[in-house]
């Protein structure tokens, strides 16, 4: 069987950037070093005049009474035909892939992945997500995108 990360990762056919802007709440993610201990994770996105996107990732450290951590960055479109492949940079010397692989028709949720499947985020416009919606996303992640969903950790929201 082919290694998961060697299979091509498909993105959505089109993203309307204006509809994508606003606040997204993290529902679940793959564990990563830069969000260790995060609860209440959210990210407001704002389209800038130059076509780039302002990103502000925020979370509380350890608990909702913990310190608010934030990282400000910028994103830019890599695939202008679909707007589904972006690069995001929080530090001037490093930019990471941000690929939109699933999105609700009404933009109520989005799934963001990485071409080598190192990272994964399930985001919602609300702090919670219906169980059947979440289950449908997990099914598509496994069957279509070849992600190991057992690695996902649910994000505590208040």
Each model region followed by its residue ranges:
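A beta-rich soluble binding module of mature secreted/lumenal proteins
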Residues: 1-158
């Amino acid at each position: 069987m082919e290694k998961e990360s060697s299979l091509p990762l498909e993105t959505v056919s089109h993203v309307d950037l204006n509809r994508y802007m606003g606040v997204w709440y993290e529902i679940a993610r793959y564990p990563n070093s830069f969000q260790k201990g995060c609860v209440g994770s959210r990210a407001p996105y704002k389209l800038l005049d130059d076509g780039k996107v302002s990103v502000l990732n925020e979370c509380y450290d350890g608990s909702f009474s913990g310190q608010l951590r934030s990282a400000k960055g910028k994103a830019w479109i890599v695939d202008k035909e679909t707007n589904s492949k972006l690069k995001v940079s929080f530090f001037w010397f490093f930019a990471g892939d941000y690929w939109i692989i699933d999105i609700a028709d009404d933009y109520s949720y989005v799934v963001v992945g990485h071409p080598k499947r190192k990272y994964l985020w399930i985001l919602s416009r609300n702090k919670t997500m219906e169980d059947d919606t979440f289950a449908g996303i997990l099914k598509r992640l496994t069957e279509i995108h070849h992600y190991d969903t057992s690695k996902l950790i649910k994000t505590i929201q208040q």
